[in-house]
Structure formats: C-alpha cells, structure tokens
UniProtKB/Swiss-Prot annotation:
UniProt entry keywords in alphabetical sequence: Decarboxylase, Lyase, Magnesium, Metal-binding, Polyamine biosynthesis, Pyridoxal phosphate, Spermidine biosynthesis
Coiled-coil residues: none
Protein purpose: Catalyzes the biosynthesis of agmatine from arginine.
Record-linked SUPFAM superfamilies: Alanine racemase C-terminal domain-like, PLP-binding barrel
InterPro entries cross-referenced by the UniProt entry: Ala_racemase/Decarboxylase_C (IPR009006), Arg_decarb_HB (IPR040634), Arg_decarbox_C (IPR041128), Arg_decrbxlase (IPR002985), De-COase2_CS (IPR022657), De-COase2_N (IPR022644), De-COase2_pyr-phos_BS (IPR022653), Orn/DAP/Arg_de-COase (IPR000183)
Catalysed transformations (reactions): L-arginine + H(+) = agmatine + CO2
Organism in which the protein naturally occurs: Prochlorococcus marinus (strain SARG / CCMP1375 / SS120)
Enzyme Commission code: 4.1.1.19
Gene symbol of the encoding locus: speA
Entry-linked PROSITE patterns: ODR_DC_2_1, ODR_DC_2_2
Residue numbers bearing the N6-(pyridoxal phosphate)lysine modification: K109
Protein name (database record): Biosynthetic arginine decarboxylase
Length: 648
C-alpha cells in the first residue's frame, strides 16, 4: 500500500501526494493502491496476492467490446472479506475462551445479483455460511442456492401464511430456515401453519431494544422501530408458543441496530440489553442456543476511523471482540451456556468488491476570457473593467488586504447587477451583457487565485471558488448506479484511476446524464469531514479520463432505478489466476434500450414499426428519400440493441 507523504521538492507532485489527497491509504485497506506510473491498482487477494492495473484492465475490456461505464466485481475480494470476518471471530473466541462458534449469513438485500449470491454461497460453504431473506422472493433464492444442511437461512421481514408454510416444508428438505418473529401477529400464523402441516419451523424472535442508535439508520432500534417485539410482546409470544407446544422450537434471539454502526458504544449497549433478554428467554424454558446480532458492521468509507456517517470508530477485530466478550460476560454471570453467534454483515462483505468506472464526456467552466474593449461600452461594463484593474493592483501588493478584496468584489457584483437591469430594460445588447458576465468572472478568478490562507476570510470570498469550478460530465446515471449519494447523501471514495503522478489543476464536481438537477456527484470524502469540490485534471483532447467510485458493492445496484430510462451497466466478474493474470468469470450485459423500454411496457418492434410507417409516409410526401429512410430505420434497430449510455 502506498503511504501518504508530502512531496519533497517545491512544486513537485508524486503518487504519494495523490494517495494522501484522495485518502487511498486510509480507506483502500489492502486492496487499492497507486503504482509508480500514477495508475490505481487493485490487489483482490490482499497484500499477499498479485495486483492489476485498472487502466490496463479497461483497455483489454475495450478490446472485448466492453466499454465504460462498467462495474468491475472482484470475487477474490469477496472471498478475502469472508476470510477476514471469520478470522476476526475465531481470534475473539480463542482470546476469551468462548465455548461456542460463529456462523454468519449474508443478507440477500445487500446485493441480490445471482452471480454475487452464488459466489458467496460457494465461497462460504467451508464455514457453513448461510443467507438472510427479507421477503418471499428472497426466501426462494435462499432455498434454491443453499444446499448445506448446516447453513442457516434467517427468515426476516413481513410474513404471510404461505411464507411460513414454505419454511416449514423446506425444513423437511434438510434446510435450516429460522422464522424470525418480527411482528406480534406472526406468532398466530406460525401456530396455524404448524397445525395445518403437522410440522413446525425453527423459530426466532427479534427484540425491539430500548437502546438508542445514531446516524442514518438510528431508527432501526428503539420503541418506535419498524420491526421487533417489545418486552411485553416477547413474553406474550412465549406464552402462546408454550400453549401451542412450540416453545422447544424457539432457538434464536435477533436484534439489529442499523445498517452502518459508526460508534462501537452503541453496539456495546445493544449487546448488553440483548444478552439479558437471551438469558431470560432461556430461563423461561426456550432452548435458544443462537444469538443473531444483525447487521451494522460498518465500512470506513473515508478512512478517518471516526464516529461519523461515512466512517466507524472501531476495527473489525474490535467489533468481534466486543460481541464475544459482552455476550460471554452476561451468560457467565447467569450461568447460561453461551450461544452460537450469527451476524448479517452484508455491507462489510460486499462493499469493497465492486468498483464503478465511468468516463468523462466533457467539461464546462465559467467564461473568464475578457472581450476586447470598445469605445461605446455601457457604464456598468466600464466600471467592471476598472474594478478588475483595481484587483490586479491589490493582488500585486506585498501583503494582500482582504478587506480591499471584499470591497472590490462587492463593487463587481453591483456593477454586474446594473448590467442585468439594463439588459432587462433593453438599454444594452446581448454582447454587452456577455462582456459584463465575463468581467465579473474574471474578477472572481483574480480574487480566488490570491486569497491568503487566513481563517478570517469572509464567507462570500470563500464561496467564490465554488462558483469557478469545472463541471465534469459523467457517463452514468447516479439514480441507477449510485442512488444513495442522492437519497441519503452517502459518501463514496471517488478519484481518477490514472494520471495520479500529475498534480490536479482543477476543482470540480460531476453531473450525470439525466435531465435532473439532482443528478450530480458534488460531495466528497475528506478525512472525517466532507468537501464539495474534488481535485481533478484538465481533460485532454481525444483521451479518456476515467473516474472510479469505490466501496459501492452494497445496495447501490439493487436500489438503482430507471430515471430517464438509463439502465444497468455492464458488470464483469474478475478472478486472479495462478499465473498472476486474470480471467473473466462472468460478463453480465447491461440493459439495452430495448430492455428499458420493455420495462415501461413499450414494445420495441411496435416502436420500430411506427417509425417505419412514418418514414413511408414521408417518402410518399417527397420529404424523405428512400435511402435516408432506410438509414434511419437501421439506426433505430441498432440503437435498440445498444446500451442506454453514450458510446466512446
């Protein structure tokens, strides 16, 4: 891993500076780095394995007609994350002498893509790793893919009679589905289904903890949380199960404190409360034996190791240690056998393995070129020219007076407004208005280039930089590929994957392809904080400028939508080979235009026929030549088969 170090010589820029700037040595763990050529590399097997240069990989994928935007899925990273998770719990179990083991499950909702779930099931078989389902459709996936009789199928979510009956029948297939009671009325459904089929499911109860959480998913716990039983409801459920002769099937307690726990103290409090509930259920006669601590094992998106929304103040080993130690302490005090531990750590497992790569289509910036002065310019334009001259003089002073900069900027804004008012009233023409805008931006650029590093800089002057930034047009839809950036303001690491031996010379943000003002990436990680501009390079003519969004393997693909009918991108599953090279295990083609049209109930053949009929009519009227009509139809036919994104 490249370590952060400032450049040693004045004006010299190195890959170490880029590594520090984008935080790669903080959030990249053992997987992502920068080589001496300034290109991002991925080491899917961690520090012990070989690395791949992403730009080289992209060039070879282009040779296979697989162009950006692309999702690169590194299945070796999935395997490495599974190994790390089990190793952490094994270490904790050995350290504390915990007399049971850990056996996790993957929540299908994190990434429901078939190849992803299949890969996790295959890799996880050595640990009897199972799946968690939160719906009837996800239950069917779990039943079909998990054929290990020792692996758990945790059945969460709302349940009707058919859901529960399916789990009972699946148990007779040799599977281990555990129906987790999350609503009080599910107790009656379980009893009814058991009586109907003459068999019972394995049963768990989700507790609604009183402990308060924090962050975006803080409402996952507490008295008003969506799922779980309150303490009175748990006691009532035990009574009903006892009366129905089903208490012996109650083997699991489950709780959940949010998708991303950023503060380990929240988990500790939840573990203490849940452990007490567990021993009480055992005391009431339930066999128990299993404690599911839910999801929440967090991902440090910015590498700051802080209790912020984009980070965590604990490591994986801290997490495993606290789970094991807290539960053991409580059970030991009450002389209850410690349970088998289960977690639903989907975000931790799947975030790192997927990288979204997109190309920049172009850029735009504010107009700062100054028009040649003419003799009959209006007063506001003359005043703006004079203000710009004053700014040049201020900036040539040995010590720049910020108050003078502020005064000049206030003048520039007033003169610009004068020009706009004159244009609205018809006193100046479009050319003079354009000149006024150019001069105003030239004033802004002059101020931004000479602002001293002073904490007392007025906010109005600090905001100038934001107005001068470049907009980089990205060949993606954030609503399809990064919906959490829009929906919950999630931060993901973004950076160029090449040219990192060069010092960035621009500040910018990204605008996507959608016709939506929310379609942008304008918030970026910044070592525990966030920034609204990203350091980027000037895009060179006739050269690709590739950007990578990292740590997006959980939820982004499955929650994306078809806004403006931009569909899924191509997804490539990549594995390292023993000779140090790589192979493409799976190529999952993204949506074509025909696919997304069909999703909205537009039949491609019908659309094509309507265009053909319109062309024929135009031919009859003499407004369209036959060869041009054929060319149009061929264009449409080809376009229907192609990606919804722009072609390189």
């Amino acid at each position: 891993m490249t370590k952060s170090k400032p450049a040693t010589k004045k004006n010299e820029w190195t890959v170490k500076d880029s590594c520090s700037l984008y935080g790669l040595d903080l959030w990249g763990e053992e997987y992502f780095s920068i080589n001496d050529s300034g290109n991002v590399t991925v080491s899917p097997q961690g520090k012990e394995g070989n690395s791949l240069e992403l730009t080289h990989l992209l060039e070879e994928l282009k040779g296979r007609n697989l162009n950006t935007p692309l999702l690169l899925r590194f299945d070796d990273i999935l395997e490495d994350r599974l190994k790390k998770l089990h190793q952490a719990f094994e270490n904790a179990i050995n350290q504390y002498g915990y007399n049971n083991d850990y056996q996790g499950v993957f929540p299908i909702k994190c990434n429901q893509q078939r190849h992803v779930v299949e890969e996790i099931v295959t890799i996880g078989r050595k640990w009897h790793f199972g799946l968690e389902a939160g719906s009837k459709a996800e239950l069917l996936i779990a039943l079909a893919l998990v054929n290990d009789p020792k692996a758990f199928l945790i059945c969460n979510g709302y349940k009707d009679n058919r859901y529960i009956e399916t789990t009972i029948l699946a148990r007779q297939l040799g599977r281990q589905p555990i129906v987790v009671i999350e609503q009080s009325d599910e107790v009656g459904r379980i009893i009814k289904a058991s009586q109907k089929l003459g068999a019972a499911p394995l049963i768990g109860i989700r507790a609604k903890l009183s402990n308060q959480s924090s962050g975006r998913w803080g409402n996952s716990v507490g008295e008003k949380s969506k799922f779980g039983l309150s303490i009175p409801e748990i006691l009532k459920a035990v009574q009903e199960l006892t009366a129905a002769g089903l208490l012996n099937e109650l083997i699991l307690l489950h709780f959940h404190v949010g998708s991303q726990i950023n503060d380990i103290a929240i988990l500790k409090n939840a573990l203490q409360e849940a452990s007490q509930i567990y021993v009480e259920l055992n005391r009431l006669g339930a066999p128990m034996g299993h404690l599911d601590v839910g999801g929440g094992l967090g991902v440090d998106y910015d590498g700051s190791r802080t209790a912020t929304s984009a980070s965590t103040n604990y490591s994986l080993q801290n997490y495993a240690n606290d789970v094991v130690a807290t539960i053991q302490e409580c059970c030991k005090a009450k002389k209850v056998k410690v349970p088998k531990l289960i977690s639903e750590s989907g975000r931790f497992l799947s975030s790192h393995f997927s990288i979204l790569i997109f190309n920049v289509l172009g850029t735009s910036s504010v107009p700062t070129q100054i028009a040649i002065e003419t003799s009959n310019e209006c007063l506001s334009v003359k005043n703006l020219r004079e203000t710009l001259m004053i700014l040049h003089q201020i900036c040539e002073e040995k010590k720049i007076d910020v108050s003078k900069l502020q005064e000049a900027w206030n003048d520039a804004l007033k003169f610009k407004e004068d020009a706009l008012n004159a244009f609205r009233l018809g006193f100046i023409d479009l050319t003079e208005r354009a000149t006024a805008e150019q001069l105003t931006w030239a004033c802004a650029k002059q101020i931004a280039a000479h602002l001293p590093n002073d904490l007392k800089i007025p906010k109005e002057l600090l905001a100038i930089n934001k107005g001068l930034t470049e907009t980089y047009y990205a060949n993606i839809s954030i609503f399809r590929s990064a919906p959490d950036t829009w929906a919950i303001q999630q931060l993901f690491p973004l950076l160029p994957i090449h040219r990192l031996q060069e010092k960035p010379d621009q500040l910018g943000h990204f605008a996507d392809l959608t016709c939506d003002s929310d379609g942008k990436l304008a918030r970026f990680i910044n070592n525990g904080q966030e920034k609204f501009l990203l350091e980027l390079h000037t895009v060179k003519a006739n050269e690709n400028y590739w950007i990578g969004m990292f740590l997006g393997g959980a939820y982004q693909e499955v929650m994306g939508n078809l806004h403006n009918l931009f569909g899924s991108t191509n997804a490539i599953h990549i594995r390292l080979t023993k000779n140090g090279k790589y192979k493409l295990d799976h190529v999952v083609r993204g949506n074509s235009k025909s696919d997304v049209l069909q999703a909205m109930e537009h039949d491609s053949e019908q659309l094509l026929e309507r265009i053909r009929m319109a062309s024929e009519s135009a031919i009859q009227q003499g407004s369209l030549k036959i060869n041009d009509a054929q060319r149009l139809i061929e264009h449409v036919e080809t376009s229907l088969r192609q990606s919804t994104y722009l072609q390189e």
